[in-house]
């Protein structure tokens, strides 16, 4: 490709409304342009990267035995009513009517459509297992689209769905997809971690997320320093206390604490050990008999809302009680709450169950109890794992301790079981002629999200530093003053033809531009390898090669340059 015949569209200035580096650089590098909130057009450079990501995804899916199909982006509402998600999905589901007043949705996901397809096309166990995938545009009407294509309303996704009659083949396909996703991200040259994950709104049992590691990542990953164990912070298991509860050494006493509304203020003002304090959070209960539930964690720990949401006594989705409701039930407000004398179900974290002589709110405004002890001052409450893990704690496999990293979720695989097939009556006849509900798996990759995540992991102060496999171009040719030198023009043109002939994606900057502008554009769009041609190079019989990632420069003889560049891509 010649720049003179290409829409490069680079920008010098960082757009003011772009919050994260990937959004900034995708705009500056001329990869995307905003059409409306959360809606983007891909310009040539962006589309080249998107297509390379898509190609790797497609190759690995085919290699894993999945079969490509294509389903409509527009879906009939009847299918969503059938599964119950018409009411459950919320405002992210864009709904509309056609000219015949029939309800439709713009698909955020395709479980309903694929299940409907399979129940009509597959009738016998002999046709199973089956794994079908598509690479298709999705739409989710995000309340606040942000971060460019990282969280846009319209996005490109690979979604696969597998169907099984037995758990064994479902597990085999799950493992194959796990490996395929690992292969996809490895081939793209990205540092990543697969992590145990919560199944979220899609539901199901087994679930893993695939995270591209980046300091800007929204998700916190807890991983083992001594094994492959890793989990989303929402899913990471807290260790059970190994120590016994200490004996009571303090008397229970009521203390005035008028200026201590938070744990931090309480600790600072009274010189307390934060591990000897607890936080009490009031949430809505799941039953009329217990409309409120108290959740208690140690002062230095954080409540894990996903874990709490799964408690039988707690209403789902988890909802914190408003202050007015708390005051009406307890007579005090947040900052002064605690377990002593609390007239509602109390669930404590396991770490709280071994505490002694601890401090908590007294359920009276501006007052706390110090020296609280279980089974002396109050009954030992029900205990559960309801907190986030902490760095340095032992991991569940016993092979290391927790460390933390930030990541960007780009893939998610689920074992759905019969969540959709049962509600949609997707069945087949087994070998005995009996009707059996299908088991399902679901496997998603955010194709456009990978593009942004790759940038968040690979950039410097000059622009994007693409991994080789997904760079828009592999090689950039920079002829210095080619419009003033026939020698430079001839050699640049010949090199361009030679590299193109061996299948290397090459961009020849044949503009009448200053060298500084040409170098800046090549570095901004992140081309991995650049070759500089000038009269001095020609006199010496060498090209000047520069590696975008390392900054390394070296002279390469004319007759060796093609093989040199081919070897770099091997």
From Swiss-Prot:
The keyword Cytoplasm applies. PROSITE patterns: AA_TRNA_LIGASE_II. The keyword Cell cycle does not apply. Keywords: Aminoacyl-tRNA synthetase, ATP-binding, Cytoplasm, Ligase, Nucleotide-binding, Protein biosynthesis. One of its GO terms (cellular component) is cytosol. GO terms for biological process: prolyl-tRNA aminoacylation. Its main location: cytoplasm. It catalyses: tRNA(Pro) + L-proline + ATP = L-prolyl-tRNA(Pro) + AMP + diphosphate. Transmembrane segments: none annotated. GO terms for molecular function: aminoacyl-tRNA deacylase activity; ATP binding; proline-tRNA ligase activity. Consists of three domains: the N-terminal catalytic domain, the editing domain and the C-terminal anticodon-binding domain. PANTHER family: MITOCHONDRIAL RIBOSOME PROTEIN L39/PROLYL-TRNA LIGASE FAMILY MEMBER, PROLINE--TRNA LIGASE. Homodimer. This is Proline--tRNA ligase. It comes from Shewanella sp. (strain ANA-3).
């Amino acid at each position: 490709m010649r720049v003179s015949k290409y829409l490069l569209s680079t920008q010098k200035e960082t757009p003011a409304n772009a919050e994260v580096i990937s959004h900034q650089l995708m705009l500056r590098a001329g990869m995307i342009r905003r059409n409306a909130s959360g809606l983007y057009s891909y310009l040539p450079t962006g589309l080249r990267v998107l297509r390379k990501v898509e190609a790797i995804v497609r190759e690995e899916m085919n290699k894993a035995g999945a079969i490509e199909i294509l389903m409509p982006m527009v879906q009939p509402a009847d299918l969503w009513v059938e599964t119950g998600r018409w009411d459950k999905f919320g405002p992210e589901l864009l709904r509309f009517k056609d000219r015949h007043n029939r309800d439709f949705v713009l698909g955020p996901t395709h479980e309903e459509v694929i299940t409907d397809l399979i129940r009509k096309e597959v009738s016998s166990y002999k046709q199973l297992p089956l794994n079908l995938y598509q690479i298709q545009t999705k739409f989710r009407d995000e309340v606040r689209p942000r971060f460019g294509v990282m969280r846009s309303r319209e996005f490109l996704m690979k979604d696969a769905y597998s169907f099984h009659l037995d758990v064994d083949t479902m597990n085999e396909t799950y493992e194959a997809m796990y490996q395929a996703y690992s292969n996809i991200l490895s081939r793209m040259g990205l540092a990543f971690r697969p992590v145990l994950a919560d199944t979220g709104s899609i539901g199901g049992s087994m679930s893993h997320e695939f995270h591209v590691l980046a300091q800007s990542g929204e998700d916190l990953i807890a991983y083992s320093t001594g094994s492959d164990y890793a989990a989303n912070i929402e899913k990471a298991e807290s260790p059970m206390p190994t120590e016994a509860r200490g004996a009571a050494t303090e008397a229970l006493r009521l203390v005035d604490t008028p200026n201590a509304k938070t744990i931090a203020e309480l600790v600072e003002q009274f010189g307390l050990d934060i591990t000897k304090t607890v936080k009490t959070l009031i949430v809505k209960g799941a039953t009329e008999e217990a409309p409120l539930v108290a959740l208690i964690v140690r002062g230095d720990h954080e409540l894990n809302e996903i874990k709490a949401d799964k408690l039988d006594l707690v209403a789902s989705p988890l909802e914190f009680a408003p202050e007015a409701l708390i005051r009406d039930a307890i007579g005090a407000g947040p900052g002064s709450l605690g377990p002593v004398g609390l007239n509602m179900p109390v669930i404590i974290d396991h770490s709280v169950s071994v505490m002694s002589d601890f401090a908590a709110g007294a359920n009276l405004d501006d007052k706390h109890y110090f020296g609280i002890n279980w089974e002396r001052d109050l009954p030992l409450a029900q205990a559960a794992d309801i907190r986030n893990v902490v760095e340095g704690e032992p991991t569940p496999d016993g092979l290391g301790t927790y460390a933390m990293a930030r990541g960007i979720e780009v893939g998610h695989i689920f074992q759905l079981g019969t969540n959709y097939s049962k509600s949609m009556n997707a069945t087949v006849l087994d070998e005995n002629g009996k009707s059996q509900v299908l088991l399902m798996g679901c496997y998603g990759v955010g194709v456009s999200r990978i593009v942004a995540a790759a940038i968040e992991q690979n950039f410097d102060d000059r622009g994007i530093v693409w991994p080789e496999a997904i760079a828009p171009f592999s090689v950039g040719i920079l002829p210095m003053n080619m419009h003033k030198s026939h020698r430079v023009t001839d050699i640049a043109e010949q090199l361009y033809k030679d590299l193109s002939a061996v299948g290397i994606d090459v961009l020849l900057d044949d503009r009448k531009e200053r060298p500084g502008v040409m170098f800046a554009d090549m570095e901004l769009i992140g081309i991995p390898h650049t070759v500089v041609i000038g009269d001095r190079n020609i006199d010496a019989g060498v090209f000047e090669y520069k590696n975008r990632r390392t900054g390394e420069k070296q002279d390469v003889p004319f007759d060796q340059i093609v093989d040199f560049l081919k070897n770099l891509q091997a």
